[in-house]
């Protein structure tokens, strides 16, 4: 069954990336599209006229389209950018392919006047409306190619990593890995970069390692991702629960993770309370305390998590080692040898 683009973005928060961009308006230096001309302006007007003549357009969106026309005519690019961002967030605009049409027939006509990273972020949001992941991938790859210029490398990294997300969804692990390696080198070359770019990078890297069951690498990358976003503002409750679940499983199965303090202290773990995974938090605390009795009491719950159930011997061994570490830690310094 072909994956949809909306499914691909069910967990990405980072993809809600219109925040963390310091400048909404742009100048010629910010452009990664050819300069708009009279034909572009006319095309944009024709599109808006066509939309406003459509009786099926929701009433709550008509004010947006009317303001688009007015602000475009007055060349108030900053205000127009803000209106477009608001439109893309509006629940009534989520019907497919409203975002795609707006981007292709209107946003592109004044793209040179938008900050390149804001424009790229708009493209990421638009990609969610493609019905098939392959179409979303082609769209983002086109934008990534257009931004592969010295002055727009941060936007190029953002778009490349979001394209890599769809490559991962389509099972193309080698292309995903290639994008990760290339973008890592680009990020290392930057003096500074907006959090939205790092968030996209770490999120996709984390999901790549999750797909390969590389627990420690997933754990490390997803904590870096969480550090780049406002969790409550950018992740739904369901996304937070899934993230806390995945981090918990990775902490338990990671063969180099013997300290759960970072996870136990992170607000994301509280999302498990009241969920079907609440017992995972209890299990983490049992491991962190080296509490074998608590582990045995929770052992029947592992049947609901096949990955944990398949690694019970490893978990016992890990708990014994963590219990030893806990015991040594609490011994007085005079008793240690």
Regions found by a protein language model. Give the residues of each.
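Amphipathic alpha-helical segments of tetratricopeptide repeats
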Residues: 141-148, 181-189, 224-233
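TPR-repeat structural position
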Residues: 130-133, 173, 215
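"A position-specific structural signal for the A-helix of alpha-solenoid helical repeats
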Residues: 162, 166-169, 197-211, 246, ...
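Start-of-helix signal in alpha-solenoid helical-repeat scaffolds, especially tetratricopeptide repeats
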Residues: 100, 114-120, 154-159, 197-200, ...
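Alpha-helical scaffold segments of alpha-solenoid architecture
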Residues: 212-337
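Eukaryote-biased activation of long, low-complexity terminal tails and linkers
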Residues: 2-139, 160
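Short coil/turn linker motifs that delimit alpha-helical repeat modules in TPR/alpha-solenoid proteins
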Residues: 151-152, 192-194, 234-236, 312
């Amino acid at each position: 069954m072909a994956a949809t683009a909306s499914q691909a973005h069910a967990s990405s928060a980072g993809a809600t990336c219109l925040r963390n961009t310091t400048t909404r308006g742009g100048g010629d230096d910010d452009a990664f599209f050819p300069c708009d001309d009279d034909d572009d302006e006319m095309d944009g007007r024709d599109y808006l006229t066509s939309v406003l003549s459509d009786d099926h357009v929701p009433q709550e969106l008509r004010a947006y389209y009317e303001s688009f026309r007015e602000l475009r005519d007055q060349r108030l690019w900053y205000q127009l950018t803000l209106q477009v961002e608001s439109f893309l967030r509006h629940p009534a605009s989520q019907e497919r392919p409203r975002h795609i049409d707006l981007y292709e027939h209107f946003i592109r006509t004044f793209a040179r006047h938008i900050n390149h990273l804001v424009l790229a972020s708009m493209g990421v949001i638009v990609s969610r409306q493609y019905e098939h992941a392959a179409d979303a991938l082609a769209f983002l790859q086109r934008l990534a190619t257009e931004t592969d210029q010295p002055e727009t490398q941060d936007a190029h990294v953002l778009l490349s990593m979001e394209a890599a997300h769809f490559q991962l969804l389509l099972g193309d692990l080698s292309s995903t890995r290639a994008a990760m390696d290339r973008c890592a080198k680009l990020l290392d070359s930057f003096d500074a970069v907006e959090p939205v770019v790092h968030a996209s990078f770490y999120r996709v890297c984390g999901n790549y390692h999750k797909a390969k069951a590389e627990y420690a690498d997933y754990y490390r990358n997803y904590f870096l991702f969480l550090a780049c976003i406002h969790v409550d503002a950018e992740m739904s409750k369901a996304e937070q629960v899934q993230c806390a679940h995945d981090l918990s499983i990775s902490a338990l199965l990671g063969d180099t993770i013997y300290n759960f303090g970072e996870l136990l202290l992170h607000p994301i773990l509280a999302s498990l309370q009241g969920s079907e995974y609440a017992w995972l938090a209890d299990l983490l605390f049992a491991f962190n305390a080296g509490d074998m009795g608590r582990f045995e009491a929770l052992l029947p719950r592992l049947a609901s998590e096949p990955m944990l159930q398949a690694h019970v011997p490893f978990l016992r061994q890990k708990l014994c080692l963590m219990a030893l570490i806990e015991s040594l830690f609490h011994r007085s310094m005079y008793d240690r040898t």
